[in-house]
């Protein structure tokens, strides 16, 4: 088995494969989200996890300012969830951010606490040091509640 590699998305084919991963997760990504994701994959920094030529997952980030970096999108192929790929991508993004002077990582996720698919998403971020700082209901442009999480990045 080939070791997993994480690198910056550069190939058009990788964008297509990232979008397919998201399409295969309809409980997390709706059509409006997929359209926004397609735009962001082409315009923002995206890291892809690759093994043996296969895209396993991706994370897209965008600077909010000189100190804060936001995770816009993150997904791992459905059949590979829970195997540490998301954690590795997150650690990669954190190191990338620290090397560029970012001090805070921000992520927004569904704030609808009755919607079960996002329970695992919220738990994922919380177990990796993210702290809920706000519930915005409704979140502008989403039409639904959003939870905002932050994580302070420690420099070595």
Regions inferred by a protein language model and the residue ranges of each:
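Short hydrophobic/aromatic beta-strand or adjacent loop that forms the aromatic wall/cage
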Residues: 44, 144-148
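Conserved GNAT acetyl-CoA-binding A-motif
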Residues: 97-117
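Residues forming the Rossmann-fold NAD(P)(H) cofactor-binding site
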Residues: 87
């Amino acid at each position: 088995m080939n070791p997993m590699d994480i690198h910056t998305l550069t190939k058009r084919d990788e964008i297509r494969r990232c979008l397919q991963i998201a399409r295969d997760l309809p409980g997390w990504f709706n059509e409006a989200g997929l359209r926004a994701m397609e735009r962001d994959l082409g315009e923002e920094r995206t890291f892809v996890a690759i093994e043996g030529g296969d895209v396993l997952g991706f994370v897209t980030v965008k600077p909010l300012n000189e100190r804060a970096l936001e995770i816009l999108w993150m997904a791992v192929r459905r059949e590979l969830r829970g195997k540490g790929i998301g954690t590795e991508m997150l650690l990669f993004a954190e190191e990338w951010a620290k090397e560029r002077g970012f001090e805070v990582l921000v992520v927004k996720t569904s704030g609808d606490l009755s919607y079960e698919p996002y329970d695992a998403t919220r738990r994922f971020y919380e177990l990796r040091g993210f702290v809920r700082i706000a519930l915005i209901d409704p979140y502008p442009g989403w039409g639904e509640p959003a939870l905002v999480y932050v994580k302070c990045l420690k420099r070595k």
